[in-house]
Amino acid sequence: MKTPLRYPGGKSRAVPKLCQWLPAEITEYRESFLGGGSMAIEMTKRYPDIPIWVNELYKPLYLFWLALRDDGDYLYDQLIQLKQRHPDQGSARQLFLDAKEKVNEDDLSYKDRAVAFYIVNKCSFSGLTESSSFSPQASDSNFSIRGINNLKEYSKLIKNWKITNLDYRELQSDESNVFLYADPPYQVKDNLYGHKGQMHKGCLLYTSPSPRDS
């Protein structure tokens, strides 16, 4: 189990190498930019008894993780039904377009926004979010019954996570054995996060000041 999502810049393949650099003693794990969660999931498996505090500024993604932790059965039930009602690429395209409209609807429950986010993530090119377009191939291979079935196991795994939607600096600590992992968005040509990439731009400007400014 690596991650329930397809996420740009995700570290699922790099996790084994990253873990080679872990300190000998860790009493708490914190992650400022959760994203696809590969590193936090690995740390939970390696250190099942330590506190895990993860943070995500992008609201739809934060709500997905929150719903996965607290309402995994609901996500599973809704997504299974939607997949069964939209088995072909034509109907999946309309499901994707509807989900894109729902991801940022404040009037919806956080659970239904999480359902919408998962659909957009799984049915788009490269796991992009609201700035993405529909991928027929992804709607078959990634928005799958098998992937939805796995959500229950992920829900159990992260049941003790503390999940927040805060400024990344809130997770900083002076305690020597608190391990903070920070992997902010990359500066790339494509806008990856949020509506038309606005979240991606904001994150870059906010979290990546020039060394000359320090």
Where in this protein do the model-derived segments appear?
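Conserved, well-structured beta-alpha core segment at the onset of a catalytic domain
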Residues: P4, K17, L22-I26, E42-D49
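Single conserved hydrophobic/aromatic residue that forms the stacking wall/gate
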Residues: Y206-S214
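SAM cofactor-binding core of SAM-dependent methyltransferases
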Residues: E28-S91
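Short, glycine/acidic-enriched loop or turn micro-motifs at the edges of active sites
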Residues: L34, K59, E170, Y186, ...
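Gly/Ser/Thr-rich active-site loops/lids in small-molecule metabolic enzymes
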Residues: M199-L205
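Hydrophobic alpha-helical segments that mediate membrane insertion or helix-helix packing
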Residues: S32-G35, P184-P185, T207
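SAM-dependent nucleic-acid methyltransferase catalytic core
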Residues: M1-K17, A24, R69-G194
